[in-house]
Amino acid sequence: MSLEIFVADIKEIPLHGKCIDVVTSSHALEPNGRNLVLLLKDLFRITKRKLILFEPSYELNSKEGKDRMDSLGYIKNIEAEVEKLGGKVTDIIPICEVSNPLNPTACYVIEPPTVKSVTLDSPVYCVPGTDFKIENNGSFLLSKDTGLLFPILDGIPILRTNSAILAMAKFKKS
């Protein structure tokens, strides 16, 4: 098994659409209540078969726990939001052993919406949140489509939009 790490923003995943068979998350969506729909859309974009979310369950929580989640801006209504976006929650499994009873975790097993698009056998880096492929020139990852360069520091690609460098001159034809 090989592992490639990169730095990215969860709102703009720098992978080509439909290139990951099973995507998982463990409390990564939790503090992003205002961005749940945006995050689900991008997760659906890259997921081929299943999205498995281990996230707090507002619906399974107590009144005190719901108040806490509301005050912290945590996500809620995962099932409803998934279905609005065309996905399907096939199972919700409450996790019995939780460290904080005011933050009960559930495992949401989700099928992403069916869309006609190119699927890839393996992950390919792209301009964050898009399917514009980027190429590795050793020092940078570069997009001929957008003119953006992304730095590589100590072998780790930094694939955040706010870290990109606009370098159109690098792509001009003589």
Task: Name the predicted role of every residue range.
Residues 28-29, 56:
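Hydrophobic adenine-recognition pocket in adenosine-nucleotide-binding enzymes
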Residues 31-42, 46-47:
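A short, conserved alpha-helix within the catalytic core of class I
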